[in-house]
Amino acid sequence: MITREFDTIAAISTPLGEGAIGIVRLSGTDSFAIAQKIFKGKDLSKVASHTLNYGHIVDPQNQEVLDEVMIGAMRSPKTFTREDIIEINTHGGIAVTNEILQLAIREGARMAEPGEFTKRAFLNGRVDLTQAEAVMDIIRAKTDKAMNNAVKQLDGSLSNLINNTRQEILNTLAQVEVNIDYPEYDDVEEMTTQLMREKTAEFEELLTSLLNTARRGKILREGISTAIIGRPNVGKSSLLNNLLREDKAIVTDIAGTTRDVIEEYVNIKGVPLKLIDTAGIRETDDLVEQIGVERSKKALQEADLVLLVLNASEPLTDQDKQLLEISQDSNRIVLLNKTDLEEKIELDQLPTDIIKISVLHNQNIDKIEERINQLFFENAGIVEQDATYLSNARHISLIEKALESLQAVNQGLEMGMPVDLLQVDMTRTWEILGEITGDAAPDELITQLFSQFCLGK
């Protein structure tokens, strides 16, 4: 693979702030030469590739030593970008990493754009678009299962599936072309209407099966959106804090203290649960609280799971009954809190599968996690170890468009259209799938995607 010609770029690859180590990364033809200008140690042009080399970063203008470093020297093409890469490992800190970055830029490097290292890896054929996107998914993964799914995508699980499907579609199109251009070739099977119907059904089944993983993939990537609802002061925020095992929401005895929607994540069996602590849903004249209530209602409508909290020490109120009614069609778990107090709630008016808890005394909180696991994981088989899951909205949209093109082929077949006239829609399916891997993606899309990456990646 011949890499494209680019100027040499540089960026800080570690988070800005104090830390044990900071890394300034360079990529491009002049990486070694630029690093050598500011490095006092071994001659980098002579060191073996993929080695760490001890020395100091020195300002060539005044010979001031900036830091004691280890330099990682990696020669193309066996690097992430398939270009020469230098990684300067410094002591962590904002000042020292910035000083070294500015030195590299002064000596000939250019400040990298967000995601430019990964973009070069894509443009140089090191990764395709799905693998590049997987890099960001790994960075943003909140649990081990989300990370594992992203790692599989980085390893090419989705790419291989899409590429194999595209190849089968291309073979079908080639067969049609041969039938049209060389009808005298008896050794090539004729693409009959029936055979085209079978091929189309095969492609549809494969893409539909992949699309059906989108819900699971979304959960792995974004978490189970979980709204904690209940009238004011029944213990919603205390439950949130208990699940998180830290204080993040405001907990007081004053009704209405949660005036907004608070979002936090908790790890349930390796899958992120996005907990949304809502303001108590009640009528109020307080404008700020009204906004929180409206957001709570919206969160309830959009939630994958609803945790409805009721107060066991009080009879059911009209608000409780309203919440039971509006959440009955949701994926819901009803929680009876404050069971350490005298029970006054009417159990005969509640669902039979309630969970009795005491947030104050941390009683039966583990049963909530068990019920969530049953609802989403055990019953639904949510996460299979070796499966490939669609988790990217762009991929999902393109698979849906590809299926629409295949449905157009089917409609044409039902109408009795000749096979050769259906090539347009079949070709469109092939092109759409190419947008997923980047083989047929427009430059504007590629630029937009990589602009979402962080600097230094």
UniProtKB/Swiss-Prot annotation:
Which keywords belong to this entry? Cytoplasm, GTP-binding, Hydrolase, Magnesium, Metal-binding, Nucleotide-binding, Potassium, tRNA processing
Q: Which GO terms describe its molecular function?
A: GTP binding; GTPase activity; metal ion binding
- The organism is Streptococcus gordonii (strain Challis / ATCC 35105 / BCRC 15272 / CH1 / DL1 / V288)
* Amino-acid positions noted as binding GTP in the UniProt annotation, renumbered to this chain: 233-238, 252-258, 277-280
Give its E.C. classification number. Answer: 3.6.-.-
Cofactor: how and how many bound:
Binds 1 potassium ion per subunit.
Residue numbers binding K(+): 233, 252, 254, 257
**Species lineage:** Bacteria, Bacillati, Bacillota, Bacilli, Lactobacillales
Q: How does it assemble?
A: Homodimer. Heterotetramer of two MnmE and two MnmG subunits.
Q: Where in the cell is it found?
A: Cytoplasm
- List, alphabetically, the Gene3D superfamilies matched: P-loop containing nucleotide triphosphate hydrolases, Probable tRNA modification gtpase trme, domain 1, tRNA modification GTPase MnmE domain 2
User: By what name is this protein known?
Assistant: tRNA modification GTPase MnmE
Which PROSITE patterns does the record cross-reference, listed alphabetically? G_TRME
Q: What does this protein do?
A: Exhibits a very high intrinsic GTPase hydrolysis rate. Involved in the addition of a carboxymethylaminomethyl (cmnm) group at the wobble position (U34) of certain tRNAs, forming tRNA-cmnm(5)s(2)U34.
Give the UniProt family note.
Belongs to the TRAFAC class TrmE-Era-EngA-EngB-Septin-like GTPase superfamily. TrmE GTPase family.
Which GO BP terms apply? tRNA methylation; tRNA wobble uridine modification
Cofactor(s) it depends on: K(+)
Domain TrmE-type G residue range list: 223-377
InterPro entries for this protein: G_TrmE, GTP-bd, GTP-bd_TrmE_N, GTPase_MnmE, MnmE_dom2, MnmE_helical, P-loop_NTPase, Small_GTP-bd
Which amino acid positions bind (6S)-5-formyl-5,6,7,8-tetrahydrofolate, per UniProt?
Answer: 25, 87, 126, 457
Give the primary localization class. cytoplasm
Residues holding Mg(2+): 237, 258
Under the cellular component aspect of Gene Ontology, which terms does the record hold? cytosol
HAMAP family assigned: GTPase_MnmE
